[in-house]
């Protein structure tokens, strides 16, 4: 009996070791549809860093290009053919890639949507709360405007799920301030050059406005005011390193940064690994709630000072990790290296 027990224990140990070895051979696919954007670049680096830090991922297969839902459908199907165990996707829109997601999950592939939601029920969603992101910033802005006047509404990419959700949040805040009106509404495409040209054109037109809400393309908006000598108005942006620095350094600027961590990509990889390890969460939707850091209150100034990081690209969010989800170091995300690189 004693010998049998020892044999069983040894067998259990071998089975356990085999399980660990198998866990270290996960292949994870990544699908992203926007390049040339600092937020998305940080997201990709967070995915790589988390995969490396986990010690459980053998390789990443990354489809990272500028495309639409049709192109992303093709990318996801290619990842399915490549034999990945999981796919982490930042969707082009909420329902445009549902068919490919369903094809993946029908084959037992775990699918996690990050940053913005999808409507396919077989997918897991780990997203920044985009509606609340817009609401917090817009409400603060309208209060700074004294509850009246004209706001410039600088949105993201037309048709993107995150932009649609942010529009709901912005309009929810707008409904609370009937004396605030939208002077101009533009889509920046989340591209810095495009947004800067748009605000320069608006400034040059000479139409008065009292505030600017941006969907995260922010530091170049401040640059446009400073370079043109235009009097500053309150500006809302995201927690991008450049804008966070400006909120502490640009004289006369009143503004607020709303957190929207690109590191949600790393959290999505962590969730995919957790599910592959047999530890799927009870709920398929996880929202990361934003926080507002303003430079008009002592508490806000302290938060901005603590978050500032001059070592990051100006376009990268300073929230480079998400407590309870990501496990990599600052050096690892900045290095932007995944398994085998």
Model-derived segments and their meaning:
Residues 51-65, 150-153, 174-192:
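Short beta-strand elements in bilobed, periplasmic/extracellular small-molecule ligand-binding domains
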Residues 27-50, 54, 60-74, 84, ...:
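Extracytoplasmic "Venus flytrap"
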Residues 39-53, 133-137, 161-180, 198:
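Short, solvent-exposed amphipathic alpha-helices that sit
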Residues 94-132, 150, 241-254:
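Flexible loop/hinge segments that line or gate small-molecule binding clefts
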Residues 77, 85-105, 170, 188-247, ...:
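Hydrophobic alpha-helical
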Residues 17-23:
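Sec/Tat signal peptide C-region and signal peptidase I cleavage site
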Residues 25-26, 173, 271-341:
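Hinge/cleft segment of the Venus flytrap/periplasmic-binding protein
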Residues 28, 72, 126-151, 165, ...:
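Hydrophobic alpha-helical segments within soluble ligand-binding/sensing domains
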